[in-house]
């Protein structure tokens, strides 16, 4: 069987890579930022579409939805000034990704792995809460970091390779 090029075999994957590279190179050019927002969202959005088309398992579908939320969150963070909508979309991404990881838990965790899980879960929001200079934002950032820490902890406790 002949080896086909990535462009023939997985064009959405190649387009996703191209969009990611294009965004980071074009943002230093003379183009208005408004034109770059869809390119930024396309990098992860095309991964979501690729995943949806190539895999039909419930985990893959949930991960595709998660990538879709992350793509919209990326674009919302570029558009919005208060970052609420982007933050909520990324919060949703973390919760959906956590769902994939929790459905694929390791049957047993060693004591060191349990310690790592608890550390990620607790320290991520605690550190994030102390970081903002604007203390009015500390609670929102801490809540977001709780979802981030929970996702990282559930990924660590999953059967997926580290």
Kindly label every feature range from the protein language model.
Residues 1-162:
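Polytopic alpha-helical membrane-helix bundles and their juxtamembrane interface segments
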């Amino acid at each position: 069987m002949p080896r086909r090029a990535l462009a023939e075999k997985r064009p959405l994957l190649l387009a996703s890579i191209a969009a990611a590279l294009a965004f980071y190179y074009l943002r230093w050019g003379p183009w208005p930022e408004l034109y770059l927002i869809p390119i930024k969202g396309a990098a992860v959005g095309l991964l979501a579409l690729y995943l949806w088309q190539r895999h039909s398992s419930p985990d893959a579908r949930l991960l595709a939805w998660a990538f879709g939320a992350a793509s919209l969150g990326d674009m919302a963070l570029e558009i919005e000034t208060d970052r609420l909508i982007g933050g909520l979309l990324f919060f949703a991404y973390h919760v959906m990704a956590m769902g994939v990881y929790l459905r694929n838990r390791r049957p047993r965790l060693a004591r060191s792995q349990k310690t790592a899980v608890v550390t990620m879960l607790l320290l991520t929001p605690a550190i994030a809460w102390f970081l903002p200079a604007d203390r009015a934002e500390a609670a929102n950032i801490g809540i977001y970091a709780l979802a981030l820490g929970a996702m990282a902890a559930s990924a660590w406790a999953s059967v997926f390779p580290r």
